[in-house]
From Swiss-Prot:
NCBIfam families referenced in this protein's UniProt entry, alphabetically: IMP_synth_hisH (TIGR01855)
GO cellular component: cytoplasm
Pathway: Amino-acid biosynthesis; L-histidine biosynthesis; L-histidine from 5-phospho-alpha-D-ribose 1-diphosphate: step 5/9
SMART domains the UniProt entry points to: GATase_5
Residue ranges annotated for the Glutamine amidotransferase type-1 domain, each copy included: 9-215
Database matches in SUPFAM superfamilies: Class I glutamine amidotransferase-like (SSF52317)
Name of the protein described by the UniProt record: Imidazole glycerol phosphate synthase subunit HisH
Pfam families on file: GATase
GO MF, any single term: lyase activity
InterPro entries according to UniProt: Class_I_gatase-like, GATASE, Imidazole-glycPsynth_HisH
UniProt key word Hydrolase: yes
Length: 215
């Protein structure tokens, strides 16, 4: 498909958590037209959707509750859905985090089956700073990426039910997924913050924008 005359229209979900300004700037640098929206009706017309996030899993899922149905529908329809940090964790089925703070089982979007788990006791958390990305399999989001460094801030990590969901890994005493994707490939997320990861992050965002145009 010739995408040279098209601009990707991307919706950045505003559910009260996330580095909205820096993610917007990064996407715009990658050539996207970004709409910051708290209206699920905006999702279906977009070329792609970004679910950002900083903070606790339970708060994220509570705030994103009004968007659940629209996000699941968009994913089922094949729209690109990109979760960042907490947004990636919310793509999974559940998280230990809610149980750890006594909130019981909080259900995620269940678009990538699996559970978010805490780093082992004794491991310094949060895992914060630059770390290496090791690509595990092909996916459009990692085009031109392997061995580069990205910026992480997190205490929990994704443990997908299926190893095939792992697109890239990072090592922090334990090897954990840095990028995951669903079986269809249109739902994916990065545990790191591409908007804080310099040229590597910009390449990831560019890959997302290109994928939005090519689907």
């Amino acid at each position: 498909m010739d995408t040279t005359d098209r601009t990707a229209e991307v919706v950045l979900v505003d559910y009260g958590l996330g580095n909205l300004r820096s993610v917007t700037r990064g996407l715009e640098r990658a050539g996207a037209e970004v709409t910051l929206s708290a209206d699920p009706d905006d999702f279906s017309a977009a070329d792609g959707i970004v679910l950002p996030g900083v903070g606790a899993f339970s708060e994220g899922m509570e705030n994103a509750g009004p968007f659940r149905e629209a996000l699941v529908a968009a994913a089922a329809d094949g729209q690109p859905l990109f979760g960042i940090c907490l947004g990636m964790q919310m793509l999974l089925t559940s998280s230990e985090e809610a149980e750890t703070v006594g909130q019981g089982d909080v259900r995620g979007l269940d678009l990538v089956p699996g559970r978010n788990v805490r780093f082992d006791e004794g491991q310094k958390v949060p895992h914060m700073g630059w770390n290496e990305l090791n690509v595990a399999r092909d996916h459009p989001i990692v085009e031109g990426i392997d061995g580069e460094y990205a910026y992480f801030v997190h205490s929990y990590y994704a443990a997908p039910d299926d190893d095939a969901a792992v697109v890239a890994t990072t090592d922090y005493s334990v090897e954990f997924p840095a990028i995951v994707a669903n079986e269809a490939g249109n739902v994916f997320g990065t545990q790191f913050h591409p908007e804080k990861s310099g040229e590597t992050g910009l390449q990831i965002l560019q890959n997302f924008v290109d994928y939005c145009l090519e689907r």
